[in-house]
Amino acid sequence: MLQMLPLIFDEPDADLCLPARLKPNRNLARTGGNKILVIDDDQILCLGIDTRLKANDYNPCFAHDAESALSTALAEMPDLIILDIGLPGHDGYFVMQSFNAYPELVDVPVIVLTGLDGFTHQRRCSDAGARRFFEKPVTNLRLMTAIRQLVG
């Protein structure tokens, strides 16, 4: 039986995206691209996102549970965070609340990428500070467009 991967790789790159809102980037000079922290316990999804981000000149780093999410974010100082809600231990809502307690993380845009659907989850994510909300699976075009709009 074939398993549907959360990211779809058979689409063209999103080269014709809307212009990105540019902001000062604390990682660009050091690493050559925006640093993006992916917080998800799905290893296959992380592998797919890693491949896609690197192909688009982003520098991914990863945390696989809520416990390591905050320490990784503080150590890596990402320009953007991609966050799953259904994490082992505490959920993604807890993670977003934790980020809001740190001035250095409060303005980092968060994209929620989750298997949870429905308006209630989308609203909760928005209220917690998420800038975008996508249900899994999401196409590369939609994800990369959102990333470009938020960090360039």
Predicted regions and their residues:
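Active-site beta3 strand of CheY-like receiver
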Residues: 76-82, 87
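Two-component/phosphorelay signaling modules centered on CheY-like receiver
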Residues: 43-61
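Short hydrophobic/Thr-rich beta-strand motif most characteristic of the beta2 strand and flanking loop
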Residues: 57-64, 72, 134
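Non-catalytic signal-transmission and effector/linker regions of two-component phosphorelay proteins
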Residues: 1-35, 141-152
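Conserved Asp/Asn-Gly motif in the active-site loop of CheY-like receiver
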Residues: 63-67, 122, 140
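The feature encodes the CheY-like receiver
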Residues: 88, 106, 118
